[in-house]
Amino acid sequence: MEDDGGSDGGEGNGGFSPNSSFGAFADTAMDLDFMDELLFDGCWLETTDSKSLKQTEQSPSASTAMNDNSPFLCFGENPSQDNFSNEETERMFPQAEKFLLEEAEVGKSWWIAPSASEGPSSSVKERLLQAISGLNEAVQDKDFLVQIWVPIQQEGKSFLTTWAQPHLFNQEYSSLAEYRHVSETYNFPADEGMKDFVGLPGRVFLQKFPEWTPDVRFFRRDEYPRIKEAQKCDVRGSLALPVFERGSGTCLGVVEIVTTTQKMNYRQELEKMCKALEAVDLRSSSNLNTPSSEFLQVYSDFYCAALPEIKDFLATICRSYDFPLALSWAPCARQGKVGSRHSDENFSECVSTIDSACSVPDEQSKSFWEACSEHHLLQGEGIVGKAFEATKLFFVPEVATFSKTNYPLAHHAKISGLHAALAVPLKSKSGLVEFVLEFFFPKACLDTEAQQEMLKSLCVTLQQDFRSSNLFIKDLELEVVLPVRETMLFSENLLCGAETVESLTEIQMQESSWIAHMIKANEKGKDVSLSWEYQKEDPKELSSGRENSQLDPVPNNVPLEAEQLQQASTPGLRVDIGPSTESASTGGGNMLSSRRPGEKKRAKTEKTIGLEVLRQYFAGSLKDAAKSIGVCPTTLKRICRQHGIMRWPSRKIKKVGHSLKKLQLVMDSVQGAQGSIQLDSFYTSFPELNSPNMSSNGPSLKSNEQPSHLNAQTDNGIMAEENPRSPSSSCSKSSGSSNNNENTGNILVAEDADAVLKRAHSEAQLHNVNQEETKCLARTQSHKTFKEPLVLDNSSPLTGSSNTSLRARGAIKVKATFGEARIRFTLLPSWGFAELKQEIARRFNIDDISWFDLKYLDDDKEWVLLTCEADLVECIDIYRLTQTHTIKISLNEASQVKLSGSFGNTGLS
């Protein structure tokens, strides 16, 4: 603003010279009224030349407005002035008695405070106070705390604070008073682009959407930095709403409502708060607003006809699989549905449940259904949002392990006891996703194997039983999302004193062996994409440079940075990194320090658990051993592999009187990393070996009568496994998931005339899982399609006793090829087609070979499918007739998807 000869002093209201930019207006009472109205809410002034603008006498109105007790609210950013000087602003704001700036420079800016008014709405702060005061009757005799968060400027950055801001709570609840005091000590980043440690108020302020949760205790530390204080004050439910000036999209602050009660539904509180704000000429995101007509699309006959089909199909599936809940989702624009998370920008991407086309057999799940109906999702949020966005089927074994940011309904699902879920997109003939069906597996279905079997069966049912003339489920990939969380160890400087915090409660999730398959498949030349939800990190100490921090250490997930993830992954893997958090800060201070380049990660407890410790628990189940040692079963398996133990030795030996074909060989020892394990060290620990059934079938072998040749080790250092066709075969695929944990070993008693235990031979050594792969596996989660196997079976067919005797009995050399990998092994005379497939799967580390086709090279040099026993007999006959030295077999991905049989010609790929 120009000033011609400097202002004379601005008497009265501190008016400007007529030669200013407002000089076009005459010096009349109307002009003064105009200026009064212009400056009523305050404004920023800026000089455009080097002349000074002085106000030598304090304006009564300015003095009143700038006084600390006036209802004055300073906002973190001025929408009409982007380049004002923060330093100058901070210097001038405390001046309540004099407003003077000598020799103003070009571009200098300062604040003219709002004029005092006796009206009901002299400032936003006062209006907010009136708004929450209007809730007094609503929260009376209830455990509610209502507080306001507003933006402030500190050192050039914006932060949200509730210090000295309006608040309301019932004085009878001392815990709420304490939480109010705690909240005043927190500042949350409010600058655009901030993602880390912004807290609940910060997310609402930046995203301009309301957010609520039934229980803040389910938040991760980075999502809710006040988590520890909330636990102490018994705070549970929370609702936060953005506040806007009516007709403006600029967020002025956040209203937060907390309660000591778990709440699944906040519709009533949301509507009351919105009406209270509207009464003082403010607004929030409201589900009462009608969407813009340009986005609104009324249901067509197509959608109306599809809803009964979908509803009946969901009800049928729920009855067949005992599902507690099945939901149908559609874009809000298709339904003409309104919601609190809508805006003109995102309305086209918002999806919500179709309440008339859902199936809720479980009464306890109705609260979750209501929460879904109230809380809409944006495309990309949760497995439903991902299905709309990527046009894929998405399966998650545990929805409650998602962060609230990635799945806003994760907390509601946890309270409702829901776990595994599958999202299925329904496409129209145009190829667009019109609906998404969301199925929640039975609440008791927690075992990995059970989930896999149910998933396969459900996929078959979806393909075969869904009938619609306009909607289809085919040509879709399946992506399995595996959220993994692991405890971090923090070391913070609290009150200038270094204090190391010991490990807190660890939330462990067993690594799915699906991941192992994806890693192995990629090593063999297959193209695999890994989808990251949470990156798993080894426990390590992280330091904080912030003093007097209000944030106490609690379990948290701090993923690796992108370059670290890429380095940690298997070479050649294409890593698709999803949502992650970088180094975070709260209140301007660094919360966590990143790992130094080249710093070696701390080893886990595996290194402290030696072979001697493991041997003490060989007589029991792996689950019991893991519990006694103090690790999870998955970790114990990894420890065993490091010692060369591929299978847990223990099992109860029953049905020993089976034929020699079914019970052939037993391995006498295990070649560990620190030496051999002799069977006599734990052989007598199995009481079943001395049972009457044992002795009745043949002479028993005592530990001190073991033949000398049994002391020799096997070639590959692991126990020989029983024939997979044996009814007593039991493969421990999921630790702790079966009631027969004791039946997971591989010890068998051979039954022959001399009752002698023979050791197994293998021409090629089994590929051991190296430590680097283990580390990579521990921090990955996999993306897979229907082409990839869902069922795991690592049992291996039996091998003969020696190479010479095998050849003498007609053993055949086999060379198998899978991509760039090649293996050689011996086909035993006693083997059938099943044993051949099993050996190939074991050598290539394939979990389920039924997903692949076997082909052999015939006498015409053509590749012929090998699908059954008859094909194998034909292959062997050709081998003998042509007198070739080796049978050549090729392993390729199956041309058709096979889930519990086959989809037939469904087109799934």
UniProtKB/Swiss-Prot annotation:
Superkingdom of this protein's organism: Eukaryota
- Which positions fall inside the RWP-RK domain? 595-676
Major site of localization recorded for this protein: nucleus
Matching entries from CDD domains are given as: PB1_NLP
Q: Which GO terms describe its cellular component?
A: nucleus
Presence of keyword Protein transport = no
Q: Which SUPFAM superfamilies match?
A: CAD & PB1 domains (SSF54277)
PROSITE patterns membership: PB1, RWP_RK
The entry's keywords: DNA-binding, Nucleus, Transcription, Transcription regulation
Q: Which InterPro entries match?
A: NLP, NLP1-9_GAF, PB1-like, PB1_dom, PB1_NLP, RWP-RK_dom
The UniProt regions of compositional bias labelled Low complexity, in chain numbering, are 725-745
Q: Where is the PB1 domain?
A: 811-894
Please list the residue ranges that the record marks as compositionally biased, kind Polar residues.
Answer: 55-70, 690-716
Task: Tell me yes or no: is Transcription regulation among this UniProt entry's keywords.
Answer: yes
Give the region (Disordered) as residue ranges: 51-71, 536-556, 568-605, 690-745
Gene Ontology terms, MF aspect: DNA binding; DNA-binding transcription factor activity
Q: What compartments host this protein?
A: Nucleus
Q: What does this protein do?
A: Probable transcription factor.
Q: What is this protein called?
A: Protein NLP1
In which organism is this protein found?
Arabidopsis thaliana (Mouse-ear cress)
Species classification: Eukaryota, Viridiplantae, Streptophyta, Embryophyta, Tracheophyta
Q: Name the encoding gene, please.
A: NLP1
